[in-house]
Amino acid sequence: MNYNEVAKILAESLPYIQKYRGKTIVVKYGGSAMLDEQLKKYVINDLVLMKCVGINLVVVHGGGPFISSYLKKLNKESVFIDGLRYTDEETMDVVQMVLSGKVNKDLVKLIQSYGGKALGLCGIDGAMIKAEKISKGVDLGKVGEITDINTEIIISSIDNGYIPVISSIALGDDNETYNINADTCTFKIAAALKAQNLILLTDVPGVMRDMDDNSTLISELRLKDIKALYEDNIIKGGMLPKINCCVEAIKSGVKSAHIIDGRVPHCLLVELFSKEGIGTMIY
């Protein structure tokens, strides 16, 4: 081990730790980092360390592959329309069971195994996330759009030393349960908390001018420059909704949004605590 190199890395991280200490950061946990056991350990380690240095951390997760896997066991086909899962009554039962009962609790357990304190929540708890059925366009069943975020439970959890781990399920005024897109849920929570940062873990390095060439990664992106990337067809496909979430979050008061590659070991620490970072920062 090169002790000088280790000391140098730790020393260089100091101004970033000071910058984020006491600030709120909301992380969307998903992609390969949620499926690969080794990557999962890297991310959980990062989350616990971030909490230990004084960051007010909130984790939001989906779990699409786990839902699809369970539906397959029930011989029920997963149907997607414009990237959103068609959610009938039976599918909603599975979504709630898998996200809140399995994925959420596994994450809480893992965080605690690394020495962190975590509290598993879903939007139904304390009517934290309110939603209504998406009424425009094609009928998606019990897929909702968020109408309100009650931050009281989230803030109370943070103040008591916990990492709130939130599954993207919401409660309607009609007392129905709604499936919420996890990216959208993350940015809505970040906006409601007026978070310092929103971080989306993905399976791509970030926003790139050429998706086949990692050297074309755009490391910093101003809000005013995004329109040109839309027009040049650089932002397209699966990146579109993620960028839209980042833009809306910043317009709502979040200081910066980051799209990073969850397949990179310790991606969160490298993005936040180094000068170069590893992904795209939008501000």
UniProtKB/Swiss-Prot annotation:
InterPro entries: AceGlu_kinase-like_sf, AcgluKinase_fam, ArgB, Asp/Glu/Uridylate_kinase, Glu/AcGlu_kinase, NAGK-C
Compartments where located: Cytoplasm
GO molecular function: acetylglutamate kinase activity; ATP binding
One Pfam entry name: AA_kinase
GO biological process, alphabetically ordered: arginine biosynthetic process via ornithine; L-arginine biosynthetic process
Pathway stated in the Swiss-Prot or TrEMBL entry: Amino-acid biosynthesis; L-arginine biosynthesis; N(2)-acetyl-L-ornithine from L-glutamate: step 2/4
GO cellular component, one term: cytoplasm
PANTHER family assigned to the protein according to its UniProt record, in alphabetical order: N-ACETYLGLUTAMATE SYNTHASE, N-ACETYLGLUTAMATE SYNTHASE, MITOCHONDRIAL
Name assigned to this protein: Acetylglutamate kinase
Species per Swiss-Prot/TrEMBL record: Clostridium kluyveri (strain ATCC 8527 / DSM 555 / NBRC 12016 / NCIMB 10680 / K1)
Lineage of the species this protein comes from: Bacteria, Bacillati, Bacillota, Clostridia, Eubacteriales
